[in-house]
């Protein structure tokens, strides 16, 4: 009888506001690290704190869009503030993939995960697609320049 291998769960987090091709490339690369891709979407309050702006789309809409992407298996909305380690623990990832433009110190994150009993590998995804078309802030800037001036 063939023994079933454990599925490798990959976790990513992000704002994912104004979904663009850079997000798709990131999600695809993250999915390639395992069998299941779980996404934690930043809570609206977290967006306000980190980006110092209102989210363009509410978290529920961003989550729904992500659920429609073929690389994504599960989506959760995070809690306001910092990383919800209890949610991460419940998800039980084998790998946490960090985006190329996310400002995380991978070593500090690993240390914080270990403190909470989470033994996941942390991998930074390199830029595969680097373009102004793949940055939400640049997209917003182009919209303003095109339609508001």
Curated annotation (Swiss-Prot):
Positions of transmembrane segments: none
Pfam families: CTP_transf_like
SUPFAM superfamilies referenced in this protein's UniProt entry, alphabetically: Nucleotidylyl transferase
Subunit structure, as described in the record: Homodimer.
UniProt record, GO biological process: FAD biosynthetic process; FMN metabolic process
EC number from the UniProt entry: 2.7.7.2
Role of this protein: Catalyzes the transfer of the AMP portion of ATP to flavin mononucleotide (FMN) to produce flavin adenine dinucleotide (FAD) coenzyme.
Cofactor(s) recorded in Swiss-Prot or TrEMBL: a divalent metal cation
Protein name: FAD synthase
UniProt: ATP binding residues: 15-16, 20-23, 101
Catalytic activity: FMN + ATP + H(+) = FAD + diphosphate
Assigned protein family: Belongs to the archaeal FAD synthase family.
UniProt keywords, alphabetically: ATP-binding, FAD, Flavoprotein, FMN, Nucleotide-binding, Nucleotidyltransferase, Transferase
Pathway membership: Cofactor biosynthesis; FAD biosynthesis; FAD from FMN: step 1/1
InterPro entries with a match to the protein in the record: Archaeal_FAD_synthase, Cyt_trans-like, FAD_synth_RibL, Rossmann-like_a/b/a_fold
PANTHER family: FAD SYNTHASE
Molecular-function annotations in GO: ATP binding; FMN adenylyltransferase activity
Signal peptide: none
């Amino acid at each position: 009888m063939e023994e079933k291998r454990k599925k490798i769960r990959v976790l990513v987090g992000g704002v994912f506001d104004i979904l663009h091709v850079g997000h798709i490339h990131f999600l695809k690369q993250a999915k390639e690290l395992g069998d299941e891709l779980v996404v934690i979407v930043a809570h609206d309050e977290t967006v306000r704190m980190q980006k110092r702006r209102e989210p363009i789309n509410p978290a529920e809409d961003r989550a729904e869009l992500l659920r429609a992407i073929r690389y994504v298996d599960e989506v959760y909305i995070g809690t306001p503030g910092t990383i919800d380690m209890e949610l991460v623990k419940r998800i039980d990832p084998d790998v946490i993939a960090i985006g190329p433009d996310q400002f995380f110190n991978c070593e500090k994150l690993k240390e914080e995960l270990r403190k909470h009993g989470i033994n996941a590998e942390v991998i930074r995804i390199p830029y595969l697609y680097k373009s102004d078309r793949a940055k939400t802030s640049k997209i917003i800037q182009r919209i303003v320049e095109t339609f508001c001036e």
